[in-house]
Design a protein with these regions (language model features):
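ABC-family P-loop ATPase nucleotide-binding domain
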Residues: 1-28, 239-246
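ABC family nucleotide-binding domain
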Residues: 18-225, 229
């Protein structure tokens, strides 16, 4: 059996301009023996999509997510956000795009332990500097309440369960009304019940809030319930399958 990577044509995105595009994106890790983390990635993700990125360990899932989220730069190729070529931006412009266009949720919540939940959710809004203090507090409180944490806003992260902390991370990711949420193994450190709750929360972000969610996951059962699954092997896309489960 051949080990050649098949050429995969990504599904056509409905709409005018895709939210996120990758054109021939390759990321080489330099060293004595250079390593390709991802290679020749071509994809388009549109509005209101719920996308899984799957594959075995070391296949490049997180590397691809970080490139799409401007947390890393490709060695070659281009990443576009809503038609804007981020390769033509300086770091200040890319940071602004990360802050306004994207939200992030990771396997470990990265909440600041000395801050209350309210203050943690306000952090992206403070960095952007568009809202008054009272408006930031109101929005943070509304986000936490919408995720079932209205009675916990003045608690600190260590007073919550793992699933509750991930809810706070989702609220923080939504703080600046991004177009897309990028999630790296958001249920990876949770038990099955908490994993299901976080999954349903992310699905609600798509179906109720109209956002796009792209999530790296090892959980095949969760990936099967998403709109689309992008499968990686050895840093390349081997399948890009629409699940038609909207």
């Amino acid at each position: 059996m051949s080990d050649a990577i098949p050429q995969v044509v990504p599904p056509q995105v409905v709409g005018t301009v895709p939210l996120i595009e990758a054109h021939s994106v390759t990321r080489i890790l330099p060293g004595v023996v250079p390593t390709a983390l991802v290679r020749d990635i071509n994809l388009k993700v549109g509005e209101n999509e719920f996308v899984a990125i799957t594959g075995p360990s070391g296949s490049g899932k997180s590397s691809l997510l970080y490139l799409l989220g401007l947390l890393d730069l490709p060695t070659s190729g281009e990443v576009l956000l809503h038609g804007r070529n981020t390769m033509h931006m300086d770091e200040h412009e890319r940071a602004f795009m990360r802050l306004t266009f994207l939200g992030f949720v990771f396997q470990f919540h990265f909440l600041l332990p000395e801050f209350t939940l309210l203050d943690n959710v306000m952090l992206p809004m403070r960095a952007l500097g568009r809202l008054s203090q009272s408006a930031m507090r109101q929005r943070a409180g509304e986000l936490l309440a919408s995720l079932g944490l209205a009675d916990h806003v003045h608690k600190r992260p260590d007073q919550l369960s793992g699933g509750q902390r991930q809810r706070v991370a989702v609220a923080r990711a939504l703080a600046n009304e991004p177009a897309a949420i990028l999630a790296d193994e958001p249920t990876g450190s949770l038990d099955s019940q908490a994993s299901e709750q976080v999954f349903e929360m992310l699905r609600d972000v798509v179906e109720t809030r109209g956002k796009t969610v792209i999530a790296v996951t090892h959980d095949a059962a969760l990936a099967d319930r998403m709109h689309r699954e992008i499968k990686l092997r050895d840093g390349a896309i081997i399948d890009d399958e629409a699940q038609l489960r909207r």
